[in-house]
Structures are given as C-alpha cells and as structure tokens.
Amino acid sequence: MKLRNLKATLFMKNKISIPYGPKKFILKREEFTFTIYPHSPYMVNATGIKSFQELEEAQELLEGIFHQQVIKVRIDSTFYSQKNFDNVDLNQVYSFMKNSDTFYAEYNIELFAGMYLHPKKENYPTILFVRTGSYTMMGGRDENILNKCEMFVNRLIEKFGK
C-alpha cells in the first residue's frame, strides 16, 4: 500500500501577516501548495504531499518562508492505494462484512463493480475494494489505524481469494 496524497493543516506560532485581503492566499513552492484563509491566519493548509517525509519537508519549508515555528501538525485526510492482481469473491466478502463492527459494507454490482467499506468508527478510512484485490483507502488520519486497515484488507484477500 502506498500513500498517494495527504492534506494537512499546520498551525503557526504567530499570526501570518500577508496582505491577502478578503480572499485566501495561495502559495506554491516546489510540489507543495499552501493555502491561508483570512479567517484563520494561524493555520496553513498544505496539499500536494505524497509521503510523511514530504510532510516534514513542507513543514521546514513553511518555517523558512515565514520565519516562525510550526507548533502543531494535523493530518486532515490521506489517500492510499494498492494494485493487486488476485481474484476475490466479493459476494463472500459482503456476507462476511455484515457482522463487522468496524465497517459497513455496500455492494451493488449494477452501480459499481467494487465494494464500499464505510467506517463505523471515527478516524477510520473509507475503503474501495474491487474483485482483483486492489483497494484505495481515503480519509484516514491515524497512521496506526491505517496500518490495521491494510492488514484487515490483506486478510480479506487471503480468506476470500479464489
């Protein structure tokens, strides 16, 4: 599973004083995009981040640009994906997932060839799971929970693979 995109909010020690007027201020540096809204001048939204290492690089870059310390980093959303070439019986997975206390499964082959696994618990990602065993995880914020979800999906692939 590979992290494809991450959105984070970085909280600055002091108010950012940029003459941005009533509209948001967008700053593009390297592959990152930083957005500052006038109603929250202590917060900087960062996008275009592809790894946790890049998140640290974005933080250092921001500290260098504004000459002040980032006091807190909050991960708002992540997007992971994994491409597999297995063959998974989604009907069996759907039956199995009816008893899950973590995810609610939605599977309607006429609408979408894959399965949606919607979280029942806070901070868990939404998972799109297709019959090849490929999956994407969207919205998770906690790295430990994301690792648990990855292991969970891999167990589903092992258990229901044809």
Model feature map: region roles:
Residues M1-I127, T132-T136, G140-K162:
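Intrinsically disordered, low-complexity polar/charged tails and linkers
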